[in-house]
Amino acid sequence: MTKKIIVGVIVIIVLGVSFLNHYLKIGIPDHEGSLSVKGLNSEVPILRDVAGIPHIMAATEGDAYFALGYTMAQDRLFQMEFLRAAGNGSLSEILGESMLKSDKFLRRIMLRPRNPKEIFDNYPPRVKTMLNAFRDGINTFIKDDPDLPIEFRLLGHAPMLWSIADMMAIVKLQSWQLSSNYDMELIYRQLNAKLGVEKAAELFPYYSPKHLKILDAFGKSKPGDAELISQATQLRKLLGTNGGSNNWVVSGERSVSGKPLLASDPHLHGSRLPGPWYFAHL
């Protein structure tokens, strides 16, 4: 009886591991073979190097950016969906009610443009072609590939089709992540109210009282400073945003070439996995 129990447990474990292994492999990108997709004008070979970086060879820029959107969605779809939701203030659709405050905050700072068509119409024709092709590549992958990455299946969420406005919102989200003025303005206003202009200026010497007028648009009906700061802090933690970028310059008098040296080290959250950058060769 004991042997039968042991054998039964082993069988259950083996079957469980096999099922889990199969479940985890669903949605893993397949970089081999060939595909026939709508939207391309000609054949586009895509070679992956040992690091998995795609090398896209296309006859036109439109085809190149279509393929870029397709391969990026193939490799990073959940990360892209998360950023799309953050830019639109719809994180609660993915992560539940706990994100409602963050969504309200994101919508308050208006990352998504109110009139994206007006902005898009002012872009040069070449940029329009690139953006449209990139969007079409993403959406083609979403529509054609039924096997979603495990994150979607665990959360019971399906990716949305992309628009140009989504891209604009993500660009503004990236800019907001790299700035700290929002938080500093609110903190300074609190200090100014409690300590007075002169003492507050000692702590923030680069601020001027005239800059306080920028906060008038919030109005009395909006959340208080403390709540706004808390919401911004919560969101930065969720997005993995931390300060620390730095720049420095060396005088030409101290360089071998006799010319000044300028260095920049933007800390664009490179410690996160997956990282903020997607390497590709077009």
Feature locations, PLM:
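Hydrophobic membrane-insertion alpha-helices, especially the h-region
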Residues: 6-20
